[in-house]
Amino acid sequence: VEKFYLEADIQLEKETDDLKKAVAAVIDLPGPEDKQPDLLYFSAIFVSTGTNLNNAHFLPSELVKAENTIVSKALDVEHQEEDIIGHIYDRAYINSSNKKLNIEELASKESGSLDKDYSDMHIVIAGVIYKNRFPTLAEEVADNTWRVSMECYYNGYDVKVGDVIMTQREAELIGLAHDDKVFGKIAKIIKNGKEIAKDKIERVLRDICFSGCGIVKNPANPPSVVLETAHKKEKESINPKEIIVLDYDKIEQGNT
């Protein structure tokens, strides 16, 4: 079992009327009369489907399977798990139009259908910071000097190139060493003499268990660490000599 971190922006419940309306439509945030004075309420995009800049790929089916591991998990500082400053109390799954998705309906679908039909999905969380116990920290969060960073465990992974997803064994059969250094490199897959995929080598996380989230200081250069989903990644210049060529036929040969 390995651990993974993913950063995103914190949105305070009080920030704007538009934010209140958008978030209130998909997740439970208390009204003024229901707020507890010793708590700072916030919401954030916890994780999104697709591939982030760490070359980790989140499938919709895996995010849905992990739904019951989100709520009641701790909020810590800089991933120091003993420094608990709050907790997550609600979650919602939304699409790219910020429409709330029914989790029971999602859970009833087969993995293939989920991965095809919900490729642009996000998990929103609502949480609280114990502001009377940590007043300085709460003020800094309110001033947007911190980001929220998702924490999760995963129990194994597959390897993805374009639309082709392979088990670790299959990836090894076609020449990919069991080495973290290959992730992020460009590869093309040849099958029966034809190119069937060409893209970055990515890690598809399996059996995810969300373990909470931390708040981390905003870096000096946010664009260098903001983790975007696959459909937002920029085009990069590629040296043809650096492309890894993989023979897909070796998988079939290895399975015979």
Identify the residue ranges that each predicted region occupies.
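Signature of dsDNA virion morphogenesis modules
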Residues: 1-253
